[in-house]
């Protein structure tokens, strides 16, 4: 069975994040090893949500999984809370990537043509750095990286 580290948030309400990724990948025969970046009451598109950032835990995953000799066929990152998390995801990738490891990034920057309020230029620069390490980039990051005039991003 193939194994994937799935680095994403856990949203209690909304069809997204780990609650969507785990069943889809599992149905495809992939064992999911979740790495929670944050726990949210609901996804960020709702007018009211609360978020607990789990940035401080990410180095613990690298430490514990490294000591347990973990190996992954894929590493997939989704919602990240900021530049520090991006740096830690890069550390995770550099630690666990092997020659065959597929790297996927879904930058989770906004919905319906609107950027999320927390999405800053610093976060964009971190996403650019993260995508240099990846095999597959999900939209809409290609719009920002290509510097095209896209109506929701300056």
Residue ranges of each PLM-predicted region?
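Small-residue (G/A/S/T)-rich helix-start motifs and N-terminal tracts that mark the onset
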Residues: 1-73, 148-154
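Residue-identity detector for glycine
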Residues: 12-14, 29, 42-45, 66, ...
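Conserved beta-alpha-beta core of the PfkB/ribokinase-like small-molecule kinase fold
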Residues: 77, 83-154
């Amino acid at each position: 069975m193939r194994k994937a580290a799935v680095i994403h948030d856990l949203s209690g309400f909304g069809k997204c994040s780990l609650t969507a990724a785990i069943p889809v990948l599992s149905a495809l025969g992939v064992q999911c090893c979740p790495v929670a970046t944050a726990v949210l009451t609901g996804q960020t598109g709702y007018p009211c949500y609360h978020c607990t950032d789990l940035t401080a835990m990410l180095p613990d995953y690298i430490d514990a999984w490294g000591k347990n000799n973990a190996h992954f066929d894929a590493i997939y990152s989704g919602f990240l809370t900021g530049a520090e998390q991006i740096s830690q995801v890069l550390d995770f990738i550099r630690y666990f990537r092997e020659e065959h490891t597929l790297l996927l990034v879904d930058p989770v920057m906004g919905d319906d043509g609107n950027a999320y309020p927390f999405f800053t230029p610093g976060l964009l620069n971190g996403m650019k750095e993260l995508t240099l390490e990846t095999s597959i980039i999900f939209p809409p990051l290609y719009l920002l990286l290509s510097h095209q005039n896209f109506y929701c991003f300056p």
